[in-house]
Amino acid sequence: MTSGLILTERKNNVLWVTLNRPKKFNALTRQMFLDLCTVFNDAADDDDIAFVVFTGGKGKYYCAGSDFSPAELSTLTDIQEHGYKLFVDILIAFPKPIIALVNGHAVGVSVTMLGVMDAVIAIDTATFATPFADIGVCPEACSSYTLPRIMGHQKAAALMMFSEKFTAHEAHIAGLVTQILPAATFEKDAKKIIDRYSKLSPITMKVAKELMRTTQIKDELLTVNRKEQVHLNGMFSHEDTIARLTAKFVKPSKI
């Protein structure tokens, strides 16, 4: 069972996983990460599921990243057991294709997680931003490993060091996005692509992923995920980070 903020629907041999927190732009909470862990673990063991489609619910945002409200920040003290790190570990080891259907703006962890997914189909109005330097945090979800290899060092640095926002077209040129679809026909065109993929050999897709993401690469990614989390946890005690997060996410009290 999930909290209702994560929706799942099986369409033939495809599992659709949808973020369902539109009032908060689908920002991810600790509980949502834990729910995603359950959903993906179950999908990994289900022989009737060929691959997973990961997308956002209604609204202009695919996902606004992690929820950095004070209540959520307080859950980040235990790195090893936090749902966020556990979910990234699951994505790294997930044996079947994961297709990100980016149907709106993507921010923070929703961008960095794309590096451990297998295809990224984006609406042409989407933007991609990782404003780490704006709030005093660091790369996450193995992005310090994956994005320089996907985009090249300078493009990855523009995104993660200098808080540059990428359009869907720019992200496509950089290699982060696999395909761009026009907003006017996005849902119809995306469905056609997913329907075509659903008719492909699930065994071929699974074996191809296993051969591409070797045990050595998985181990490297797991190590990077742990290293990033250690750095991230340490940054939460820095005065600069505290000041930036407070200014961005904490509403001043009304006296």
UniProtKB/Swiss-Prot annotation:
InterPro entries, sorted: ClpP/crotonase-like_dom_sf (IPR029045), ECH/Chromodomain_protein (IPR051053), Enoyl-CoA_hydra/iso (IPR001753), Enoyl-CoA_hydra_C (IPR014748)
UniProt name for this protein: Uncharacterized protein B0272.4
Record-linked PANTHER family: PROTEIN CBG16141 (PTHR43684:SF14), PTHR43684
Keyword Isomerase (UniProt): yes
Any single GO CC term annotated in Swiss-Prot or TrEMBL for this entry: peroxisome
Annotated Pfam families: ECH_1
Keywords in alphabetical order: Isomerase, Peroxisome
Similarity comment text for this entry: Belongs to the enoyl-CoA hydratase/isomerase family.
Protein's cellular compartments: Peroxisome
Metal-binding listed as a keyword: no
Source superkingdom: Eukaryota
Naturally occurring in which organism (per UniProt): Caenorhabditis elegans
Record motif Microbody targeting signal, residues: 253-255
Gene3D superfamilies assigned: 2-enoyl-CoA Hydratase, Chain A, domain 1, Lyase 2-enoyl-coa Hydratase, Chain A, domain 2
MF term (GO), any: isomerase activity
